[in-house]
Amino acid sequence: MKSLVKAKKEPGIWMQDIPVPEYGVNDVLIKIKRTAICGTDIHIYSWDEWAQATIPVPMTVGHEFYGEIVEVGKEVQGLKVGQRVSGEGHITCGFCRNCRAGKRHLCRNTLGVGVNRPGCFAEYLALPATNVIALPDNITEEQAAILDPFGNAAHCALAFDVVGEDVLITGAGPIGIMAAAIVRHIGARHVVITDVNDHRLELARQMGVSRAVNVKYQKLSDVANELGMLEGFDVGLEMSGNPMALNDMMKAMNHGGHVALLGIPPQETPIDWNQVIFKGLVIKGIYGREMFETWYKMIAMLQSGLNISPVITHNFPVDEYQHAFQIMASGQSGKVILNW
């Protein structure tokens, strides 16, 4: 089958012909229809320090997908050939304390599809049935292909009560933009998103934010004053991994505010802990998606009218994957989809 493989320990991704994956009695085999390129895939393509320390070579990459079931393991229940599906890309052990307590997103033994085990940038993917999400008919193929990152956004955006609250989002990448759409959809008052990338800030405006702020040219404090906010932001969603953005967020928070951290800093990051302690801030780290409550909620939000389509900016046939990766890496895009 056709696949995109990290075949060498150097920058790049290579298209190769590899065997169709075998599947076990508790697995399903999925015919891949659409995939989306993630920031993780760009790290792997670039072969940065994280990728060098994490990715076994060779490795079929990719973890954001839409497809249809073509084979079902003999012990699988509740799924059948022909169903439209996406899937959870974190494979958990099922036996640790958190897994047994129903908190699989906190499994210490997690393996990542397209990271530690073969991924979805291929014509077929074998996946444990427990990780497969059967899709309602009113979820489109494009929406299904980005449910994984949409789930990151939902997990973060729903970490704290945002109804009637003023929300600050630092980082207007695709996940930050989708988080902005979510908090607006569920009842936040003012939603402010910051970045230094004007292209992505414009995408955020299309998603209905109150203000999209380029912090190179405008101060957050001025924006808050213009919106009539006298006491700071109630909820902060840090999506950028930028140390300066994180500290700007701490300064902008109201006393007793809540901060969810999804962005990953590139190095050890100094924080002004006086902002945290004397303001009584609550900080929560966010990783992946809650299994599977986040999946239920994000599909329900799409069914109830949440529109995330503006974040999908490019579609390419898989044979044009090199150009697709370049577009995604440029920062001048939202989500980039490969059609198989």
Curated annotation (Swiss-Prot):
Q: What class of enzyme is it?
A: oxidoreductase
Stored Pfam families: ADH_N, ADH_zinc_N
According to its UniProt record, the EC number is: 1.1.1.103
Look up the record and name the pathway of this protein.
Answer: Amino-acid degradation; L-threonine degradation via oxydo-reductase pathway; glycine from L-threonine: step 1/2
State a single Gene Ontology molecular function.
zinc ion binding
The residues that the entry says bind Zn(2+) 2 are: C93, C96, C99, C107
CC cofactor: Zn(2+)
Gene Ontology terms describing biological process: L-threonine catabolic process to glycine
Q: Where along this sequence does the record place binding of NAD(+)?
A: I175, D195, R200, L262, G263, I264, I286, Y287
Q: Where in the cell is it found?
A: Cytoplasm
Instruction: Please indicate which residues carry the site annotation Important for catalytic activity for the proton relay mechanism but does not participate directly in the coordination of zinc atom.
Output: D148
* Transmembrane region(s): none
Cellular component GO terms, alphabetical = cytoplasm
The residues annotated as the active site are: T40 (charge relay system), H43 (charge relay system)
Quote the record's binding site residues for Zn(2+) 1. C38, H63, E64
What's the stated role of this polypeptide? Catalyzes the NAD(+)-dependent oxidation of L-threonine to 2-amino-3-ketobutyrate.
Similarity field: Belongs to the zinc-containing alcohol dehydrogenase family.
Name of protein: L-threonine 3-dehydrogenase
Origin species, per record, is Legionella pneumophila subsp. pneumophila (strain Philadelphia 1 / ATCC 33152 / DSM 7513)
